[in-house]
Amino acid sequence: MQNDAGEVVDLYIPRKCSSTNRIIGAKDHASIQINFAEVDPTTGRMTGQYKTYAICGYIRQMGESDDCLKRLAIKDKIIDAKMDA
């Protein structure tokens, strides 16, 4: 629903699982959202930017959330592909 200014208000906007692209329902209490902070390579401090991933409860139930997060982090070049071994 939009107000007169065109802003979205009072509307549930569901998230999607970053790994499977499934919609995470409102009653999926096992789902998680995790932020990876970007770090300045010279100072070693956080830059204030981060990458957000959402993992649905179905993936967590199967015990595959760690593999999914690692695969997504390699795809987004957060960790090196050499760590895949």
Swiss-Prot record:
InterPro entries: Ribosomal_eS21, Ribosomal_eS21_CS, Ribosomal_eS21_sf
GO biological process: translation
Localization per Swiss-Prot or TrEMBL: Cytoplasm, Cytosol; Cytoplasm; Rough endoplasmic reticulum
GO MF terms held by the record: structural constituent of ribosome
Keywords of this entry: Cytoplasm, Endoplasmic reticulum, Ribonucleoprotein, Ribosomal protein
Annotated GO CC locations: cytosol; ribonucleoprotein complex; ribosome; rough endoplasmic reticulum
Pfam families: Ribosomal_S21e (PF01249)
Principal localisation: cytoplasm
Domain of life, per lineage: Eukaryota
Subunit structure comment from the entry: Component of the 40S small ribosomal subunit.
Record-stated family: Belongs to the eukaryotic ribosomal protein eS21 family.
Protein name: Small ribosomal subunit protein eS21
Native organism: Branchiostoma belcheri (Amphioxus)
Gene: RPS21
